[in-house]
């Protein structure tokens, strides 16, 4: 039996997150429904990341076993795109070894967060965090350096996350990609739940001048969620790429 991986994008607006759950629309649920229509049997998938409701993906990766050996990667891609809803698109497919699990094989996950400081555009409201105040990008860049490396990220986790809070952030870049559009790029091997959005929320406080860049270091060292700023909204976040 062959095993395939797929890289795919999705608009997270109308999904209750990535992970399959009963009675709600999820990305994994739609993916497995499409596979069941193709193969006429239940196919289970393993994903590289579990995005929250409203979060988008440019390069999510999932893997699954294929019960029909004669199919090639291009057949998998075409069949899935013919059966998936319009807010999910498979960009490529490839054959992988039998024990390939993208969640554990991933060496780097790259997230992008978009902040617009322009006048609100109703057509982009589900894809950027509209923020009516100007942000000091240089101060945000200084603050971001305190978060790079291996740290206890308890201050930036979701309150009920029981996982080991020690994580390594390889790099954080803050870029003006267009006039009044800021991209915050966060790279690491793995992240706690809501960790990227909590980091963004705190960096924005620095950008507003409400916190000094050094305040981020104190928040990190406090290891307390109460010390950090509020969570940035989900619709500005994208799982941009997963590297193996």
Curated annotation (Swiss-Prot):
Alphabetized GO MF terms: RNA binding; tRNA pseudouridine(38-40) synthase activity
Binding site for substrate: 111
Active-site residue list: 52
Protein name: tRNA pseudouridine synthase A
EC number(s) reported in the record: 5.4.99.12
Alphabetically ordered keywords of this record: Isomerase, tRNA processing
Species assigned in the record: Thermosipho melanesiensis (strain DSM 12029 / CIP 104789 / BI429)
Family matches, as CDD domains: PseudoU_synth_EcTruA
Source domain of life: Bacteria
Lineage: Bacteria, Thermotogati, Thermotogota, Thermotogae, Thermotogales
Any GO BP annotation: tRNA pseudouridine synthesis
NCBIfam families, A to Z: hisT_truA (TIGR00071)
One Pfam family matching this protein: PseudoU_synth_1
């Amino acid at each position: 039996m062959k095993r395939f991986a797929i890289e795919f994008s999705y608009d997270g607006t109308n999904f209750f997150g990535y992970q399959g759950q009963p009675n709600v629309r999820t990305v994994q649920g739609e993916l497995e429904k499409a596979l069941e229509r193709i193969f006429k049997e239940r196919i289970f998938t393993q994903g590289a990341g579990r995005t929250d409701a409203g979060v988008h993906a440019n390069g999510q990766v999932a893997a699954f076993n294929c019960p029909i050996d004669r199919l090639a990667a291009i057949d998998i891609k075409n069949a899935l795109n013919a059966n998936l809803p319009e807010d999910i698109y498979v960009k490529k497919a490839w054959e992988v070894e039998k024990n390939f699990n993208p969640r554990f094989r991933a060496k780097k996950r790259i997230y992008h967060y978009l902040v617009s400081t322009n006048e609100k555009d109703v057509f982009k409201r589900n894809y950027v965090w509209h923020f009516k105040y100007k942000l000091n990008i240089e101060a945000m860049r200084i603050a971001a350096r305190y978060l790079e490396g291996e740290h206890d990220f308890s201050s930036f986790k979701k309150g009920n996350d029981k996982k080991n809070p020690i994580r390594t952030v390889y790099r954080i870049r803050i870029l003006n990609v267009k006039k009044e559009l800021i991209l915050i790029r966060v790279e690491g091997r793995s992240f706690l739940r809501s960790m990227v959005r909590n980091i963004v929320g705190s960096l924005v406080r620095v950008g507003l001048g409400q916190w000094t860049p050094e305040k981020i270091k104190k928040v990190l060292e406090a290891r307390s969620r109460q010390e950090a700023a509020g969570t940035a909204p989900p619709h500005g976040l994208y799982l941009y790429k997963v590297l193996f």
